[in-house]
Curated annotation (Swiss-Prot):
Its main location: cytoplasm. Component of the 40S small ribosomal subunit. Plays an important role in controlling cell growth and proliferation through the selective translation of particular classes of mRNA. GO terms for cellular component: cytosolic small ribosomal subunit; nucleus; perinuclear region of cytoplasm. It comes from Ictalurus punctatus (Channel catfish). Ribosomal protein S6 is the major substrate of protein kinases in eukaryote ribosomes. The phosphorylation is stimulated by growth factors, tumor promoting agents, and mitogens. It is dephosphorylated at growth arrest. GO terms for biological process: cytoplasmic translation; glucose homeostasis. The keyword Zinc does not apply. It holds the Pfam family Ribosomal_S6e. This is Small ribosomal subunit protein eS6. PANTHER family: 40S RIBOSOMAL PROTEIN S6.
Length: 249
């Protein structure tokens, strides 16, 4: 089995092949995201602690977190799931994935070093790979350089040098995201003001409608009362007429 070991602190990654089954037994029956001591791999790994981050079986199917089996299953996957990239909007597909439990049928096991041991591993912990790009978000630039809210972030952007043959060397900087500027604050104030105006307008319209509704209800009530009074007058008139006719007879 091959072990793909990475060390985030230096940005290095190394692929080693382990033929001895006894060295690998410490990883068997362990689940993804489990932290395991790497001492059985050899003397140089003494004190190292690694986390199982994934792997692939001999046919190339990836391990999927949350699938509690050491075999292969077919799952209906959609956008947002691991082990699947949709090609169309809303597309779902049934894909074969391997469970999150490690066994001997894996060809590659991915490990991340959580704690460094006593000795350096050549090509993994003794050298550093510089990051190609610096942080882009304002809060992350502040965190990197330990800046306060009063400091200007724009002066601390990590610029990337661009060199071309026969041309003057220049640098390129990313556009800072979530940067709070007077313009952003102005837009925010405008949004809040517009929201207040909309709320007030809705309130005024609701009050006006309630007033109109009360007026219409009052008019309808008066109309109904007039009709009832008219009906009563007519019925009393008819009653008096019938009485007078009967008395004449």
């Amino acid at each position: 089995m091959k072990l793909n070991i990475s060390f985030p602190a230096t940005g290095c990654q190394k692929l080693i092949e382990v033929d001895d089954e006894r060295k690998l037994r410490t990883f068997y029956e362990k689940r993804m995201a489990t932290e395991v001591a790497a001492d059985p791999l050899g003397d140089e790994w003494k004190g190292y602690v690694v986390r199982i981050s994934g792997g692939n079986d001999k046919q190339g199917f990836p391990m999927k977190q949350g699938v509690l089996t050491n075999g292969r299953v077919r799952l209906l996957l959609s956008k947002g799931h691991s082990c699947y990239r949709p090609r169309r909007t809303g597309e779902r597909k049934r894909k074969s994935v391997r469970g999150c439990i490690v066994d001997a049928n894996l060809s590659v096991l991915n490990l991340v070093i959580i704690r460094k041991g006593e000795k350096d591993i050549p090509g993994l912990t003794d050298s550093t790979v510089p990051r190609r790009l610096g942080p882009k978000r304002a809060s992350r630039i502040r965190k990197l350089f330990n800046l306060s809210k009063e400091d200007d972030v724009r002066q601390y952007v990590v610029r990337r040098p661009l060199t071309k043959e026969g041309k003057k060397p220049r640098t390129k900087a990313p556009k800072i995201q979530r940067l709070v500027t007077p313009r952003v604050l102005q837009h925010k104030r405008r949004r809040i003001a517009l929201k207040r105006q909309r709320t007030q307008k809705n309130k005024d319209e609701a009050a006006e409608y309630a007033k109109l509704l009360a007026k219409r209800l009052k008019e309808a009530k008066e109309k109904r009362q007039e009709k009832i009074a008219k009906r009563r007058r007519l019925s009393s008139l008819r009653a008096s007429q019938s009485k007078s006719e009967s008395s004449q007879k």
